[in-house]
């Protein structure tokens, strides 16, 4: 089944952009980035910015990100995928990253949430951004929670 990504959550103040791959089924139903309760994205990011993002509504989460100059988007505009595994994404359409220069002129750092999105790191690096590939926030990745948490925290130290 072909799945559509979400529009970017960025503005002229965005300095850090986190790129995922493509929303999963639960996120699409909720129309929310990282909408699956088993995904640790909001817990990880909340611990980094010092806010309990897990316990507030989605709109307030996005506002907290903007206050902290953090944006969200996905590498893929659309793609076919059965279920939620990134390894099953096929026939993907890549987002137009060229719009970032105008939409987020202060963007400096692009973080990739997991291996699949990280495959596109060279494109953003070639555009002049500092880049880093992070361990995925997926709940399926919990066995490495400690190293994942420290890796995410380290990426935000600038």
Swiss-Prot record:
One of its GO terms (molecular function) is hypoxanthine DNA N-glycosylase activity. It comes from Methanosarcina barkeri (strain Fusaro / DSM 804). GO terms for biological process: DNA repair. Belongs to the uracil-DNA glycosylase (UDG) superfamily. Type 6 (HDG) family. It comes from the Archaea. Its EC number is 3.2.2.-. NCBIfam families: hypoxanDNAglyco. Changing residue 74 to A/N: Retains significant activity on the G/I substrate. InterPro entries: Hypoxan-DNA_Glyclase, Uracil-DNA_glycosylase-like, Uracil-DNA_glycosylase-like_sf. This is Hypoxanthine DNA glycosylase. The active site is at 39. It holds the Pfam family UDG. The keyword Hydrolase applies. Keywords: DNA damage, DNA repair, Hydrolase. Changing residue 86 to A: Retains significant activity on the G/I substrate.
